[in-house]
């Protein structure tokens, strides 16, 4: 998928991962309880960023021809979601609600719409207007979910009305 959309999705997934790393670092400095969870999500978003370019999830279809990768993806999302309920419960309600909405939008596109379009693939109808419209809906949902997540995370890192956090990166020889 060599397109602007793929490039943009890769960048925002990477940005989400970097922001989770920053939040993990801030939690560590402040003796927060969620350092590990933020680090887990940082790694996860970086993997999703790589997957967006490389298409690792599509490789799963070649390994398990009888089952769509979305089946395995749904199981993984369910496990991760359940395992992170305590983490979500510790977040402020606004952040938690925005994260859940963002996740639902992203997963709805990545797994829901993708699963719904499997029919087009099975019936060799991937070069149709209908399939391409569904693909646009899928990509829009994924991008919107990540942008909302980034918004919520930035708002969580620097709450409205508080002094901004200054992060400085220096490169030395």
Residue ranges of predicted features:
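Hydrophobic alpha-helical segments at protein termini of multi-pass membrane proteins
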Residues: 1-173
């Amino acid at each position: 998928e060599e397109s602007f959309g793929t490039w943009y999705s890769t960048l925002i997934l990477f940005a989400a991962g970097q922001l989770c790393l920053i939040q993990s670092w801030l939690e560590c400095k402040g003796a927060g309880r969620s350092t590990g969870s933020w680090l887990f999500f940082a790694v996860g978003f970086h993997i999703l960023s790589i997957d967006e370019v490389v298409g690792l999830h599509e490789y799963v279809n070649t390994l398990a021809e009888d089952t769509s990768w979305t089946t395995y993806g749904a199981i993984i999302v369910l496990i991760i979601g359940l395992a992170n309920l305590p983490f979500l419960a510790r977040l402020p309600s606004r952040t938690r609600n925005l994260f859940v909405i963002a996740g639902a939008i992203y997963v709805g596109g990545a797994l829901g719409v993708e699963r719904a379009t499997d029919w087009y693939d099975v019936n060799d109808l991937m070069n149709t207007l209908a399939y391409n419209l569904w693909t646009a809906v899928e990509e829009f949902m994924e991008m919107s979910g990540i942008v909302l997540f980034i918004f919520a995370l930035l708002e969580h890192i620097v709450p409205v009305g508080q002094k901004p956090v200054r992060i400085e990166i220096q490169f030395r020889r």
